[in-house]
């Protein structure tokens, strides 16, 4: 399975990665929010022993109460864990496979949240891998399940299959034409959700968006995936149409934006987190339009490792704001200079 950060993808592919999550609870235990600290940590140990024996490759557990903040947040940047897991760090943990494509969050909103993330637009591969692991675990434990409601979860929106499917997608042309809000409203009407991958004060930046299903009750896993695929394919089609319009009407402006961004990234001494993300979006746009020849795995690595927490975790030291901006620019220059 392809790690979305390291694997090379089609340069014209505007879907960054695909993600499938399954929420599960153990029948004999209270929900995670009802467990005290001792009970929650016992649950971590119990689940880890099961998961460890079912993962064929090497796995590693991270108990959040024992881990460095920047290390934890670096896995949030890689999209392997959730903000909800971090909020209850005295009770939570997560397990990763060696490829960092499978994550098992323990005591998040539910006892288990199984997540698989893979490169590009490939929901089927993510689904196949996560269901295989889920089936193995289900043979070892009793999941909380109701014949009418399906898998029982803390959130009513996860009842049924307990599955969330999502893709992260790059939409600079739709954003440029102020069409994001219209598409977001349209997706909501068909049971989908669309939000910015990176936000500052509830305002999205970087042209990266997450599209996911909102409801699982009454739908099969296959129906959820098919519905999401249909919605995403429509968004991709519209994004490409708007790109053609931009290249026809604003060719020089687009080229200037792309090459100006590349020039700044290859020469800047200081880069803030937000500015870097926005410039990387412009360069990614240039790659997708065949204006620049840069590998997607390079851009994905930069997207992740230029986040404040990931950069500090990579350098293994805490940095002031000025040091962060200096080291970020230095890191970007070094990666882009590689053959």
Curated annotation (Swiss-Prot):
What is the species of this protein? Answer: Clostridium botulinum (strain Eklund 17B / Type B)
What residue stretch is flagged as signal peptide? none
| Nucleotide-binding listed as a keyword | yes
Which residues make up the binding site for ATP? 17-21, 164-168, 195-200
Q: Which GO terms describe its cellular component?
A: extracellular space
Q: Which reaction does it catalyse?
A: L-arginyl-[protein] + ATP = N(omega)-phospho-L-arginyl-[protein] + ADP + H(+)
Instruction: Write out the GO biological process terms.
Output: phosphocreatine biosynthetic process
Q: Which domain of life is it from?
A: Bacteria
Protein name per Swiss-Prot or TrEMBL: Protein-arginine kinase
């Amino acid at each position: 399975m392809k790690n979305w950060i390291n694997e090379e993808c089609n340069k014209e592919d505007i879907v960054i990665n695909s993600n499938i999550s399954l929420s599960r609870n153990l029948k004999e235990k209270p929900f995670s929010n009802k467990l005290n600290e001792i009970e929650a940590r016992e649950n971590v140990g119990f689940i880890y022993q099961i998961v460890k024996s079912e993962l064929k490759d090497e796995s590693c557990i991270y108990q959040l109460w024992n881990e460095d903040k920047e290390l934890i947040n670096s896995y949030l940047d890689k999209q392997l864990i959730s903000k909800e897991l971090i909020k209850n760090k005295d009770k939570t943990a997560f397990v990763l496979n060696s490829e960092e494509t499978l994550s098992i969050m323990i005591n998040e909103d539910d006892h288990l949240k199984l997540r698989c993330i893979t490169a590009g637009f490939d929901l089927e591969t993510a689904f196949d891998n996560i269901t295989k692991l889920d089936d193995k675990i289900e043979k070892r434990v009793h999941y909380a399940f109701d014949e009418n409601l399906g898998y029982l979860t803390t959130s009513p929106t996860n009842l049924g299959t307990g599955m969330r499917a999502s893709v992260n997608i790059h939409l600079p042309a739709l954003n440029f034409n102020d069409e994001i809000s219209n598409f977001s409203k349209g997706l909501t009407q068909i049971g989908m959700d669309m939000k910015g991958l990176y936000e500052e004060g509830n305002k999205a930046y970087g042209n990266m968006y997450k599209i996911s299903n909102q409801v699982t009750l009454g739908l099969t896993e296959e129906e959820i995936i098919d519905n999401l695929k249909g919605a995403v394919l429509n968004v991709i089609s519209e994004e490409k149409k708007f790109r053609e319009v931009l290249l026809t009407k604003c060719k020089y402006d687009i080229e200037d934006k792309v090459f100006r961004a590349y020039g700044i990234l290859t020469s800047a001494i200081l880069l803030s987190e937000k500015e870097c993300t926005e410039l990387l979006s412009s360069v990614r746009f240039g790659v997708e339009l065949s204006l620049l020849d840069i590998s997607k795995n390079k851009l994905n690595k930069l997207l992740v490792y230029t986040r404040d927490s990931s950069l500090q975790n990579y350098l293994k030291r805490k940095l002031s704001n000025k040091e962060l901006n200096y080291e970020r620019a230095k890191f970007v220059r070094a990666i882009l200079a590689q053959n």
